[in-house]
Amino acid sequence: MHVFNFAALFTVLATFTATAAAADQGSNTFDQRYQGYPWRPANGPIREEKQENVGHRRGGAEYFTSGSPSIAAEDYSAKNAPSRFEQWKAQQKERAERKQDRGLNGIRRVENYYP
């Protein structure tokens, strides 16, 4: 019985491998038929966005303001809009301040709520 099972399994495997190998022939022409090159980003390498190549989003600040550009858009010309690094630093500072507000065990200090 074991021998029969092994023989059946082997036949199935051999058939499958032969089919796959036959179907795989010429698959290297795929790149020539379609586009000829693998995926690449549309605008070349990812770089920090400058004011010139973005529209109303003002310098890619939406990555840090969770979808709303209003923080960077306060000054409409966006000349002084914070860079991503500055925004990150401000976030860190906020986080540190919030951490200071927490007392033992992560419970917020009572003084913050009842001055």
UniProtKB/Swiss-Prot annotation:
Region Disordered, residue ranges: 24-115
GO cellular component: extracellular region; host cell cytoplasm
Induction: Expression is highly up-regulated in invasive hyphae.
Signal peptide segment: 1-22
Keyword Thylakoid in record: no
UniProt keyword list: Host cytoplasm, Secreted, Signal
Phenotype when the gene is knocked out: Leads to a slight decrease in lesion numbers and lesion sizes after host leaves infection.
Taxonomy, superkingdom: Eukaryota
Cited function: Secreted effector involved in biotrophic colonization of plant cells. Induces an early, basal defense response in susceptible rice, including rapid callose deposition and ROS production in leaves and calli. Also promotes sporulation and mycelia growth suggesting a role across the whole process of interaction, from the biotrophic phase to sporulation.
Designated name of the protein: Biotrophy-associated secreted protein 1
Source organism (scientific name): Pyricularia oryzae (strain 70-15 / ATCC MYA-4617 / FGSC 8958)
Record gene name: BAS1
